[in-house]
Amino acid sequence: MCCNYYGNSCGGCGYGSRYGYGCGYGSGYGCGYGSGYGCGYGSGYGCGYGSGYGCGYGSGYGCGYGSGYGCGYGSGYGCGYGSGYGCGYGSGYGCGYGSGYGCGYGSRYGCGYGSGCCSYRKCYSSCC
């Protein structure tokens, strides 16, 4: 069973997602604090703090703290602190603090604080 910070199972995790596919604080499909599809603090499709499609703190399509399409702190295509394609603090495809595909603080595919197969504490530092 995979759970997020609050203990929800993977696939639908986060603080209050609507559909159960994405996760986050209150998104509709994706994850994040209030996005519509993607994840992040308030994006429309992608993830991040306020982007339109991508992810990051304020980008339009890409992700990161302010980019237009690219990414934030160090990724290759996506954005975030170190991802390869997606966005987030260290993911490989998705976004979040350490996920592999989805978004959130530690998930592998989904999103939220710890979905995929790890708990919040485990995923915060490294996801399984």
Curated annotation (Swiss-Prot):
Which regions form coiled coils? none
One Gene Ontology term of the biological-process aspect is:
hair cycle process
Q: Name what induces it.
A: Expression in skin and hair follicle is regulated by HOXC13 and by GATA3.
Q: What does the record say about tissue specificity?
A: Strong expression in narrowly defined pattern restricted to the lower and middle cortical regions of the hair shaft in both developing and cycling hair. During hair follicle regression (catagen), expression levels decrease until expression is no longer detectable in follicles at resting stage (telogen).
GO cellular component, alphabetical, reads:
intermediate filament
Establish whether keyword Protein biosynthesis is in the entry: no
Is Repeat one of the keywords UniProt gives this record?
Answer: yes
Region feature (51 X 2 AA repeats of G-[YCGS]): 11-117
What keywords were assigned to this record?
Keratin, Repeat
Similarity-based family: Belongs to the KRTAP type 21 family.
Summarize subunit and interaction data from the UniProt record for this chain: Interacts with hair keratins.
Functionally, this protein is described as follows: In the hair cortex, hair keratin intermediate filaments are embedded in an interfilamentous matrix, consisting of hair keratin-associated proteins (KRTAP), which are essential for the formation of a rigid and resistant hair shaft through their extensive disulfide bond cross-linking with abundant cysteine residues of hair keratins. The matrix proteins include the high-sulfur and high-glycine-tyrosine keratins.
Q: What is this protein called?
A: Keratin-associated protein 21-1
Species for this entry: Mus musculus (Mouse)
Q: Which gene encodes it?
A: Krtap21-1
